[in-house]
Regions:
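Phosphate-coordination loops involved in phosphoryl transfer and adenosine-cofactor binding
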Residues: 12, 62-65, 141, 150
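C-terminal helix-to-coil terminal segments
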Residues: 14-29, 43, 185-245
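Gly/Ala-rich phosphate-binding loop of Rossmann-like dinucleotide-binding domains
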Residues: 79, 83, 171-172
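Phosphate/diphosphate ligand-binding glycine-rich loop within oxidoreductases
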Residues: 1-45, 59
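Glycine-rich NAD(P)-binding loop of Rossmann-like domains
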Residues: 43-77
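Residues at the starts of beta-strands that form the adenosine-phosphate
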Residues: 65, 84-88
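Short, polar loop motifs at secondary-structure junctions
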Residues: 1-2, 93-99
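Rossmann-like adenosine-cofactor binding region
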Residues: 96-194
Length: 245
């Protein structure tokens, strides 16, 4: 968000971020969201509230196809946990050639130009993209229409990366099975937004990374950067001001 200020972007100083500090929690939430829909938690909770005893089949995420869109630190944490749960993981990223060939958590990595073909094969699409001009509404109506009717969309990246009007349409008309959203284009999300009332939309409120040790994790990252500065060492987590992350 700071890079939206022209004077900040133009300044010669090096900018760093807290990349990696909160990725573990976001990785957990990404897999949790998949399990929420697979295990039909919403139906179970509804029956409990109504004092109804129901028995119904539930799904498994083992053996299912996950596509991670945005394979940076957060996306890799999602993939690592999904792979451990027996999922088959693929990824889409801006620079697929930068993927570590030793990475055993993904079966294949493709570029943005192959996004629609990739989502068409996935049971779960987990978006972990940064907010840039290139990613703005990258998940649009065409991408959502390419997804399976049984698939679920999860967003642990930035709200601006999804066309929310198109997503409301997809959820309302059951073009996809569900969505789990931790981030939104406008925050706080206005109280009259359709997401609040859609039964096939799971929401958390940009707090999937807000763990009890959040500030400690952020401070550890700051201390690391401060030590690098004092010791004259190269900074970790340097932000590319042109790319925006």
């Amino acid at each position: 968000h700071l890079l939206a200020i022209p004077s900040v972007k133009a300044h010669s100083s090096v900018m760093t971020n807290a990349r990696g500090a909160f990725s573990a929690s976001l990785g957990e939430w990404g897999v949790f969201a998949c399990m929420y829909f697979a295990k039909r938690v919403d139906e179970m909770r509804a029956a409990q509230r109504e004092s109804r005893w129901i028995r119904t089949t539930v799904g498994m995420i083992q053996g299912k196809e996950m596509l991670v869109v945005g394979y940076g630190d957060i996306g890799q944490h999602v993939a690592r946990r999904a792979k451990a749960m027996g999922m088959r993981v693929s990824a889409v990223r801006r620079t697929p050639e930068k993927t570590d060939p030793r990475d055993e958590h993904v079966e294949r990595v493709v570029g943005f130009q192959s996004l629609k073909e990739a989502v068409a094969k996935a049971d779960y699409v987990v978006v972990a993209l940064p907010a840039t001009k290139e990613t703005d509404k990258l998940i649009d109506g065409d991408v959502l229409n390419a997804m399976k009717e049984t698939s679920v969309l999860v967003n642990v990246g930035r709200g601006s990366t999804i066309d929310e009007d198109a997503l409301v349409d997809a959820l309302s008309n059951k073009k996809i099975a569900g969505a789990a959203l931790d981030v939104f284009a406008v925050e706080p999300l206005p109280s009259d937004h359709p997401f609040y009332k859609l039964e096939n939309c799971l929401m958390s409120f940009h707090c999937a990374d807000l763990t009890s040790d959040y500030h400690d994790l952020a401070l550890d990252c700051f201390i690391q950067h401060a030590k690098e500065y004092v010791e004259g060492k190269p900074f970790t987590n340097v932000v590319d001001k042109e790319l925006g992350y």
